[in-house]
Amino acid sequence: MAEKTSKAPITVRAATGRDSVAVRALIDLYVPSGVLLPRSEDFVATYAHNFVVAEARGEGIVGCAYLDEYSPSIAELRSLAVAPDWQGAGVGRALVHGIEALARTREYAILFAVSNDEAYFKRYGFERREIPELDRERSEVSRYKGVYAKEL
């Protein structure tokens, strides 16, 4: 999708507890379709240190992503959400880069995502990877079979 150029500049930053309402609202846009799992405002506030948000000048939060520790050396990129009006404006890319930076800061060796959108994650250097423990955990509860990972 081509990037839109008429949007206000965005800043990716660490989330704070004050962002919990906006982050939950963004995630909720993608829950009915099954793309994302729901997150409560309490969850977002409690784990705000694991979220990054994309904020547009004058428009507030237009995207979010969550870094979830899977093991001491592996983390998962979750809850990647971009406001519909901001699709194609580079917000998702900025959030993926923000999560990668956070994962590197925390010294994770591998970052992975579970998704059906292989092309999206391949754009950012993720490759299909088998994580047997993850496959066993999610095989009965998830319709997402693609695991995409990259070394950091």
Predicted regions and their residues:
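Short hydrophobic/aromatic beta-strand or adjacent loop that forms the aromatic wall/cage
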Residues: 49-51, 143-149
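Conserved beta-strand in the GNAT
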Residues: 53, 59-68, 73-81
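Conserved acetyl-CoA-binding loop-helix of GNAT-fold acetyltransferases
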Residues: 82, 88-101, 113
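Conserved active-site alpha-helix within GNAT-family acetyltransferase domains
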Residues: 105, 109, 115-142
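Active-site rim helix/loop that mediates acceptor-substrate recognition in acyltransferases
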Residues: 26-61
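A generic "binding-loop/recognition-motif" signal
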Residues: 19, 73, 116-117
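A short beta-loop-alpha structural element at the N-terminal edge
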Residues: 10-23
